[in-house]
């Protein structure tokens, strides 16, 4: 399927039919308006991820915030998720899982392993193509600590490929301040992504942002799976048993489950609705 307005898109992104085409790129849109992801299904070299990501994000009609590449698995997964940034993303894992299920004609609830470049083992995704509900089991934090930020002593959770600072407050700082701070933290921790979440305990409401240094991108997702998982893990710390929690964010709610056994986090999952859009093909 081609873009509905190919001449407009080709003109603005310099992808013209008169130009000799070196490749055709197939992708599917996922996520809500304002936080759209492009799931690229064409096999491309990882060396091209950075350039293709920048070019696709520059197409204004797509209104995309992220680009992910769905590739053949390298291990025991059914599909592999890779990005130019290389950071852990619960949202992208859930979107990739549903896209895989739909592409295989799966019409019932099913669990399957999805690989990601930031973790050594596949992560279990539970998808229901009929309802669009998708849950992913994320890896537990590898380490935790504290940090003095924004005039408070904040907790820090280090996941594989991504770290989150957990603060209390009702609003995120201005973008320039966020970018500077998170860029410094990503460099200090030598990680693909550094994030911060602000939790308002009175309203039980959360906002988050993440900076990806490899693509120099600051994201403020309306409903972030990984941030919700970090919030749930922090709330359940040192409390034995099974903890279920609804995490409210500007873009909606996500359901989290944390299992603590013997003082260790044994399971961390986050789920909610995923929206898949049309599939497109672009030539350039």
Residue locations for each model-derived region?
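Short, Lys/Arg-enriched N-terminal segments with co-localized hydrophobic residues
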Residues: 8-22
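Active-site proximal loop and beta-alpha junction motif in alpha/beta enzyme cores
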Residues: 21-89, 94-223, 228-284
């Amino acid at each position: 399927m081609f873009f509905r307005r190919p001449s407009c898109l080709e003109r603005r992104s310099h992808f013209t039919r008169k130009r000799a085409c070196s490749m055709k790129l197939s992708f599917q849109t996922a996520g809500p308006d304002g936080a759209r992801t492009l799931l690229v299904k064409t096999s491309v070299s990882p060396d091209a991820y950075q350039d293709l990501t920048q070019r696709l994000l520059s197409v204004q009609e797509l209104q995309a915030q992220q680009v992910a590449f769905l590739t053949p698995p390298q291990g025991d997964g059914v599909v592999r998720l890779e990005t130019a940034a290389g950071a852990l993303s619960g949202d992208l894992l859930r979107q990739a899982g549903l896209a895989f299920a739909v592409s295989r004609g799966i019409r019932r609830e099913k669990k399957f392993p999805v690989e990601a470049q930031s973790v050594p083992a596949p992560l279990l995704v539970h998808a229901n193509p009929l309802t669009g509900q998708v849950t992913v089991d994320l890896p537990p934090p590898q380490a935790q600590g504290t940090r003095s930020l924004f005039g408070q002593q904040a907790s820090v959770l280090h996941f594989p490929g991504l770290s989150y600072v957990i603060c209390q407050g009702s609003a995120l700082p201005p973008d320039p301040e966020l970018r500077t701070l998170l860029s410094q933290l990503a460099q200090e921790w030598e990680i693909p992504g550094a994030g911060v979440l602000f939790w308002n305990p009175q309203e039980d409401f959360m906002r988050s942002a993440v900076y990806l240094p490899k693509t120099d991108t600051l994201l403020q997702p309306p409903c972030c799976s990984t941030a919700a998982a970090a919030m749930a893990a922090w709330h359940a710390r040192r409390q034995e048993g099974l903890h279920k929690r609804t995490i409210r964010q500007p873009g909606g709610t996500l359901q989290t489950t944390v299992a603590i056994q013997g003082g260790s986090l044994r399971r961390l999952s986050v789920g909610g609705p995923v929206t898949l859009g049309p599939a497109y093909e672009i030539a350039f």
